[in-house]
């Protein structure tokens, strides 16, 4: 359902928030090529967030901490797609955005295109042509047919190909930022990650009401608030001065 309290009693920042901020920190420092070190540092500093880190990611952090080296594990999980949002704001050409995002290109490209004024139809066309994504179902149909096991139980909602298209669709088929996030939560599955991906795209598409930004910031520790402020001051944001619902 889309009918839930947006800032409820048990709201906390999650692993998705932490690693998204780690990406932003690496970009601000001009060290995106060393972003893996930032992920390890943040994961060690915040080891038990709501949502929890994926098993493959945790094992990768442990190996890198113990040995100083851990190869990319070539995950097809959706974690990479949820933490790439800052890339879509920090680069000003399509090629630079794609190169920086690498395996999480679809999310970053949606943000980049929205920033540059592309219509929702143009963004969908790009996703279909460049990534092979298809969007045959409405949000109402996804609410009935989507779960942790993908659409109709024929997939895996924890991997990119069975969650990123749905997250993009939740943003494109919304009327504003809040509606997009409500779409994402309502379809079920890996809700915090789908919500993170959808929200990052929806910010660039619709903007975020000022009162909603202010409320969300109260859930973050002071150092996270400072990082968000610095990143937005340098690269911009989707902040709207108008109030939300």
PLM segments and residue spans:
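Structured, active/binding-site neighborhoods that engage oxygen-rich ligands
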Residues: 1-245
